[in-house]
Curated annotation (Swiss-Prot):
Principal location listed in the UniProt entry: cytoplasm
Highest taxon, organism lineage: Bacteria
GO BP annotations listed: 'de novo' IMP biosynthetic process; adenine biosynthetic process
Pathway: Purine metabolism; IMP biosynthesis via de novo pathway; 5-amino-1-(5-phospho-D-ribosyl)imidazole from N(2)-formyl-N(1)-(5-phospho-D-ribosyl)glycinamide: step 2/2
UniProt keywords, alphabetically: ATP-binding, Cytoplasm, Ligase, Nucleotide-binding, Purine biosynthesis
UniProt family annotation: Belongs to the AIR synthase family.
GO molecular function annotation: ATP binding; phosphoribosylamine-glycine ligase activity; phosphoribosylformylglycinamidine cyclo-ligase activity
The protein's name in its UniProt record: Phosphoribosylformylglycinamidine cyclo-ligase
Signal peptide range in chain numbering: none
Reaction(s) this enzyme catalyzes, per UniProt: 2-formamido-N(1)-(5-O-phospho-beta-D-ribosyl)acetamidine + ATP = 5-amino-1-(5-phospho-beta-D-ribosyl)imidazole + ADP + phosphate + H(+)
Enzyme class, first EC level, given as a word: ligase
Amino acid sequence: MDYKSAGVDVEAGRHFVERIRTSVEATHRPEVLGGLGGFGGLCRLPAGLEKPLLVAGTDGVGTKLELAQECGRHHGVGIDLVAMCANDVITCGAEPLFFLDYIATGKLSPAAMAEVVEGIASGCSQSGCSLLGGETAEMPGFYPAGRYDLAGFCVAVVDEPRLIDGQTIQAGDQLLAIASSGVHSNGFSLVRRILEANQVPLETSQAALGGRSAAEALLEPTLLYAPLVKALLQSPELELRGMAHITGGGLPENLPRPLPQGLAAQIDPGSWQRPALFHWLQELGSVPERDLWHTFNLGIGYVLVLPESSCQQALEVVHNSGFTGWICGEIVVGQGVLGLPAGA
């Protein structure tokens, strides 16, 4: 008996590494030393930082992977993996520096895994960070054949004098919402139950979704907000006081995270139109309003906190960067998130 007959194909693993090499090395910033194949990735700190702070974050894609694997759509979840990590670490004003991935699978499918890594590389390129390394673990008997799980790790850097920690936020500051691309990567355990209970065909056009299929709408990759945040930070006379990445828990659980004690986020639910995808899910699944607000982003993927004097310039940067943004509320004295509709 050999290793291959036990379910681990080392040669397929080598071919996989060669297949992804070009995509991975294309993401490398000037600070990266060496290429693939070392025991560890090497990366210098960017020059010109007075007191550099490293910011680290880790995350996964959750059960969105189940839907992606069922549909054979693997590229987008690679982007999702980077977005879930990078969108978190940039909330303190940090610039993503490098990314590491971990892929665990029952049996290595070089084609599917290459799609995933190409998606990860695309996400890294969009975020301006290097895909510095990764691990692909073939674990027969632990994971079913054809199934895989993903974990990502992002390290960013910020100069301590430019750290955004929310401590300068004050009553009267405005909340600038940045649109999401859809469900992003949270709430898919509920999504999958809704699809299963209603026997929704995944690849069939849905009128309620503007002609897109459920697979197309639900597997739309998470938006990467790093290019926008970088553009905002480079804008003269624009002051960013806080940021929130709207993930699991929705607006009610993520908006308070950057706020100092004694301040609340007063939102205006009438300031935006909830995307059709969320109406469709709510109707199909008879989802209570509270669960909707505490599970999904409802069309807002990222929120900026800034003084009113910076709003117009910030909105111009948002739109010039290809994103959609609007004022969705303000900071008031209080606690948590205020202004939620009845039942939320």
